[in-house]
Amino acid sequence: LVLGGFLNIVTQTGALEAGIQSVVKKLKGNELKIIPILMILFSIGGSTYGMAEETIPFYGLLSATMVAAGFDTFVAVGTVLLGAGSGVIGSTVNPFSTGVAMDALRGIGIQPNTGIILIVGAILWAASTSYSIFIVMRYAKKVKADKGSTILSLQEQEDMEKTYGQAASKEMPFTNRHKKILMVFAFCFVIMI
């Protein structure tokens, strides 16, 4: 609850949107590179502290970003959902899955080997994240090359352009205030982990 509120406050400042727009602008012509970067970040969040419902603010934010980069909203959903989901699948130190499971084992008299759990989690994390990135990247390349290859219906495509085409056109400057907010944001995640 607190984490969701914190994410909402940071989102309301516009720092996340301005930061992502800045990255997209720097990657102009190489927009595909933003997908694995974001998916790995979401995946690390999923693996370390169980980032799942905390990703809700990112759907709208990334939808506008992905449409501006020449993709569709399905790429944004895949980036967030599969990124965070693959992290949760490969939980390493996630207190909500790994921590609870280890406590449950101790409760029935089985002493878990933390090293093995970390290794298995890391292997699952790497495999699921890599495969998720592959799937989203393959679809994104297809949509970028041919807008007609999207799985969205014509009505959904029109709605996407009406909703996010306008949002993508308004550019936000990436100010020093935004940079400071994102540094505090990143620092808080490091402390949580």
Where do the protein language model's features map onto the residues?
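Hydrophobic alpha-helical segments of integral membrane proteins
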Residues: 16-27, 101, 105
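Transmembrane alpha-helical segments and their short flanking loops
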Residues: 88-119
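Membrane-embedded alpha-helical segments of transport systems
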Residues: 45, 81-94, 120-134
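Core transmembrane alpha-helical segments of multi-pass membrane transporters/permeases
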Residues: 1-17
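Hydrophobic transmembrane alpha-helices that form the pore/transport pathway of multi-pass ion
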Residues: 23-89
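Transmembrane helix-loop junctions in multi-pass membrane proteins
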Residues: 11-16, 45-54, 97, 193
